[in-house]
Design a protein with these regions (language model features):
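Core SAM-dependent methyltransferase catalytic element
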Residues: 218-220, 234-251
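A short glycine-rich, Lys/Arg-flanked "PGG" loop and its adjoining helix->strand segment in the class I
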Residues: 142-157
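Conserved class I S-adenosyl-L-methionine
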Residues: 157-190
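A short acidic, Gly/Pro-enriched loop at the edge of an enzyme's catalytic core
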Residues: 116-128
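A short SAM/SAH-binding and catalytic strip from SAM-dependent methyltransferases
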Residues: 127-142
Length: 251
């Protein structure tokens, strides 16, 4: 039986983590203690930290980390007094969450699930959903935003990190434009070969219309946005944005 692209991506990310992938390295005990003392930052996108005012007071808030495993953000939110749930499809990312929780002696609900399916939560379950860059690993993003709207409480906040597609147009050195958009290896054999050669799993470009428009169509009101770069490489050096972070509210 052929593996789904979601399974291929989970296995790819597990392998990257074993090789030292930066987004799979859990925070240190010192970083956790600093957060408890009010000194903290978290990332939705590679470089620019999320403004603290996007969150408000996190004490006793119910937060879902959506495709947010790795032991990087959830421990910070716990340190700030939140009740956290993390959902991811990578075993290694979830193992990191469990490791930090055991080390720091706190409770967190850890769920392995595919976010392209109906999310395993009741309506109106969460105050905040924290969704860092990850939807580039799924083909259709609009259903995810609809599910986020369903499971957020009225007045709840959706925080997203979004790849806006620039990365999928250029070669590895980021010197030449080699691809048209959309980038979809499920329908474009040449794009699939590119990903295979670079061990990049199965990735997809998504437009602003899909991602921000998708949030608006789901019922959200956009309240703030900022852009960001890759953090390295030629596009970064030229200050060409590859990501946006968004804050939206369920009214």
């Amino acid at each position: 039986m052929l593996k789904s692209y979601q399974e291929i991506n989970a296995e790819t990310i597990d392998r990257w983590i074993e090789e030292g992938w930066e987004w799979g390295q859990p925070i240190s005990h010192e970083t956790y203690l600093n957060a408890k003392n009010g000194n903290w930052n978290v990332l939705l996108t590679p470089v620019n930290p999320v403004p603290h005012e996007w969150f408000g007071n996190l004490k006793d808030k119910k937060i879902l980390g959506l495709a947010s495993g790795g032991g990087q953000q959830m421990p910070i939110f716990v340190a700030l007094g939140a009740n956290c749930t993390v959902l991811d499809y990578s075993d290694k990312q979830l193992e990191a969450e469990k490791m930090v929780a055991e080390r720091e002696k706190y409770e967190i609900e850890i769920i392995k699930a595919d976010m392209t399916k109906k999310l395993p939560f009741a309506d109106n379950s969460f105050d905040i959903i924290f969704h860092p860059v990850s939807n580039s690993y799924i083909e259709k993003v609009e259903p995810v935003f609809k599910e986020c709207y369903r499971i957020l409480k009225k007045g709840g906040i959706l925080l997203c990190g979004l790849d806006i597609g620039t990365n999928y147009t250029v070669d590895e050195k980021e010197e030449k434009i080699i691809n048209s958009l959309p980038f979809n290896p499920l329908v474009n054999e040449e794009q699939r070969k590119q990903l295979e050669e670079q061990d990049c799993g199965i990735q997809f470009s998504h437009t602003i219309s899909e991602q921000i428009g998708g949030q608006l169509k789901a019922g959200f009101r956009l309240t703030d946005i900022y852009d960001d770069t890759n953090g390295f490489g030629r596009l970064h050096e030229l200050n060409i944005a590859s990501f946006v972070a968004t804050r939206a509210i369920k009214e």
